[in-house]
Amino acid sequence: MIKSKGWNWKMVEDDSNCVWKIPSIESYYLLDRWKGLGFKSFLDLGCGLGRHTVLFASNDFKTYGFDISEDGLTRTKEWLDSLDLKADLKKGDMIHLPYKDNSFDCILCRNVISHQDTEGVKQIIKELYRVLKDNGECYLTLGSKSTWGFKQTSWPLVDENTRLRMEEGPEYKTPHFYADYDLIKVLFKDFKIEFINHIEDFYESNDKTYSSFHYHVLIKKVK
């Protein structure tokens, strides 16, 4: 198992236009869904700068934020404090979560668990199962083997599903795990898979258009 490595958030500007401070589109769907299911306890796994921690805390969830980055957690706390919101923030490695069994109704980990190799991802999934309550749900994303990053052969191959990102920036030398539909079915065999979506995102940079593919997966813990 490769050593876990988080983002270098010091390289990311902290302003209102920062994409990492804007809640993802699907987080609003999850907020509505999980409220409707009567869920109360929420874990933002890999909370980064706190965009989803703040969203759920401001909507009366008992909110927990977890990240490997001290800087990310510091900036999350500052944001919460500025809004007079509360959340339980912890620093650590997601392969060993510091929470009791059956702690959470719902977990969101967007572009998070992919930052490990295959063995690490399997261990994280075990932890997700452990800390979720029965009938609790987890929404997560995984890099797709259809995306450019997996095909980027200049990035070292860690194992058959994982490459080490060598592009300069906040993710430099961070492992990136990639999956396909069949692998996802195997990885989450102990859960009920509510849905799997394969989504292509487009973005502009230096007058060029780029895209990347991710799997969006909603799972439920069932006995």
Where are these regions (language model features)?
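Class I (Rossmann-like) S-adenosyl-L-methionine-dependent methyltransferase catalytic domain
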Residues: 1-39, 48-96, 120-123, 137-223
